[in-house]
Amino acid sequence: MHPHSYLNQSDAIALDVELFNYFGVEQLMELAGLSCASAIAEGFPESKNVLIVVGPGNNGGDGLVCARHLKMFGYSPEIFYPKRTAKTLYENLTKQCELFEIPFLTACPTTEGLNSKYSLVVDALFGFSFKAPVRKEFTEIIDNMLHMSTPCCSIDIPSGWDVENGPLDQDNSLKPAMLISLSAPKLCARFFHGIHYLGGRFIAPALATKYKLKLPNYPSTHNCVRL
């Protein structure tokens, strides 16, 4: 176990704004998505048939990047993207996945389909800006994920969780087998007890000091670390 601190929602948003100003969203998203793919490769090396469930915001963008890198790592990813974002960045990320011949599902997979076809489902729906309730475009896929037996890996925040208080309804909240926190763990990670990785190796010492972050050392050239 590596000792680490947590970010509340307001500090997570403020840190992201600073990072965007220094690096730009494209660079950060590429690094974050790569670290997610690397963590999945460490945590689930044999789970080659992966579905990435992509949301409309930055968390979804991380998922698209993650899918592309998983493909290059030898996985067989597929993507379910129920509400596409009409912005150049997301359109380009989608085209990149298509260039790598990653299939996009045209219909919401059933719980039975999630169980029979995939060995891992990556939850890249909502990030730390999420506020309940879940919008109707996403209720079906989240409900199917709630009832699947296939393990789930959530990027940064398990979708539907409160960013600070964790699962609001224990019986109707995702219970991922793995969580990949980005930049720094958010407060809700205190309620997570599975495989926990940290990715996003781009926090400068000055920012760590400003936000009072205690972060683990990344091993060697790795871009993720298990907490």
Curated annotation (Swiss-Prot):
Q: Which GO terms describe its molecular function?
A: metal ion binding; NAD(P)HX epimerase activity; nucleotide binding
Q: Which Gene3D superfamilies match?
A: YjeF N-terminal domain
Keyword Plastid on entry: no
What are the UniProt keywords, alphabetically? Isomerase, Metal-binding, NAD, NADP, Nucleotide-binding, Potassium
Q: Kindly give the InterPro entries that the UniProt entry links to this protein.
A: YjeF_N_dom (IPR004443), YjeF_N_dom_sf (IPR036652), YJEFN_prot_NAXE-like (IPR032976)
Summarize where (6S)-NADPHX binds, as residue positions. 58-62, 127-133, 156
Family designation: Belongs to the NnrE/AIBP family.
Q: What is this protein called?
A: NAD(P)H-hydrate epimerase
- State the organism named in the record: Daphnia pulex
